[in-house]
């Protein structure tokens, strides 16, 4: 006698599976572009079944935003007070690497949380920063321990912002060592003989199209692309919303133009910085100083390009992804020449770690632009890279 079909058994950890899948989708696509249908499909259930666990997309998003923060707090609670900095950084690194696919949610997308949820998340990360800060101060009695702590966390968090294939244990070891070097770096000991970085200026808007772009960039940076309306952009340049379409087919084309401008300015700055460098070590120093200068000088433009790139349609995103890869390839090549013991994947992970330092240290300094701040952050980037 043949047994009839067996009904599928619902896994007991269905809610956890949903949160994990949602974290990946939110991290890859952004909050507004993510759909409950896509999340449900990734879990292998219907959207209707998904709504039995979460009443709406925001509720699911808010839980995703909490997952890694809760994991970090729990991991650090298991590290005894007064433990070596290595133990603290290792605990943070293990949780972050384990949540690599979904960890990008907190860096850019957390701005879409409501005020109460954002304050709660900020308090959790504040606890993490406090534990790292305490250990950094205890182990390396140097200036700017808070800056060094957030920069070290920037190294670790960088793994959530790219897709370089690397074994989990190798990633943990590489990031922990890099973060430890950052914590031990004296930002005040930055090279005083380094020549100032001169970047190409952002183009002066001389046409209505350029004026629209210049007005849209700070709005996108402040509120997020999805939250900014055509009406807001039009009002900023004294136009009726319908008049925007004479210059751009749609709002997404304004975003694409902003991202292209960011890529062009960075590429020009890199070309200038590498002119007449003496060798690979000096080349990496020049690259670091240039990227830091670019990030401080073009903060709004850079944040838009970093946060919103994934939301562009594939046809508009393609050339930008190529430019991004070419930029990283320059860093990787020069870093491997300066540190021949690194393989390509290790070098690439460290390059992204350097970018993570700039993001978190810049935020910690509230992007106050000065020669001192630029020099300090550049020193921390070089520490992350092992130079």
Language-model segment annotations:
Residues 2, 126-141, 165-226, 367-387:
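C-terminal peripheral helix-coil segments that are non-catalytic and often amphipathic
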Residues 54, 61-68, 255-262, 305:
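Alpha-helical DNA-contacting segments of helix-turn-helix folds
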Residues 76-102, 272-299:
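Hydrophobic alpha-helical connector segments
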Residues 93-119, 153, 295-315, 355-359, ...:
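Amphipathic alpha-helical segments used for helix-helix packing
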Residues 115-140, 146-147, 173-174, 315-340, ...:
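Amphipathic alpha-helical packing segments from all-alpha helical-bundle domains
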